[in-house]
A protein has these predicted regions:
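N-terminal targeting sequences that direct proteins away from the cytosol to non-cytosolic compartments
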Residues: 2-63, 68-70, 131, 138-163
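Conserved polar/disulfide-associated segments of primarily extracytoplasmic proteins
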Residues: 55-149, 163
């Protein structure tokens, strides 16, 4: 009888632990956002509240960094020769310099990622419309689920800008 009871307890423990794993993963991907507003170029982008912010003196954008220094991002805007650029040309230029994983490449936007060494991922997104608004996000591979969710939220907020 003790033998059967031990097996039942062991199975119940394993089932409980397995049920908790997806819940932990789901919580890890929950991202809370703050909003960066650029008054010079009149655009806004949501960014994870886990980042601290330091704006560029030029007014072009901002730098973001995690408290532990393992993740960072930059958000910027530029005007100029954007009439000659598209998401496809941005990706083509990036491909010349490194092996990238293209997520999207259209006339008005592109996104791609690549590995920097074994433990770091860099994700880039560019939105082109009357100029370029972009962000670049660098993070440890161990935090991929969280920062992938963060990138999606940042992209969605960036696309809401009219210029």
């Amino acid at each position: 009888m003790k033998h059967i009871l031990k097996k039942v307890i062991a199975i119940a423990t394993v089932v409980t632990m397995l049920a908790a794993v997806p819940a932990m993963d789901a919580q890890a991907a929950v991202v809370k956002y703050a909003t960066y507003t650029n008054t010079r170029f009149t655009y806004t982008v949501k960014y994870p509240t886990t980042f601290q912010r330091a704006d560029y003196g030029s007014g072009d954008g901002t730098k973001l960094f995690s408290k532990d220094g393992k993740a960072k991002a930059t958000i910027w805007n530029s005007y100029g020769k954007t009439g000659k650029r598209s998401g496809k040309t941005v990706v083509a230029t990036a491909k010349k310099n490194r092996k990238i994983n293209v997520k999207k490449a259209t006339k008005t936007e592109c996104s791609y990622s690549y590995k920097m060494g074994k433990n770091t991922i860099q994700y880039c997104y560019v939105f082109i419309k009357n100029g370029e608004i972009a962000f670049q996000l660098t993070y440890p591979t161990a935090s991929k689920k969280y920062y992938s969710a963060a990138a999606k939220g940042m992209m969605a907020s960036l696309k809401k800008n009219k210029s």
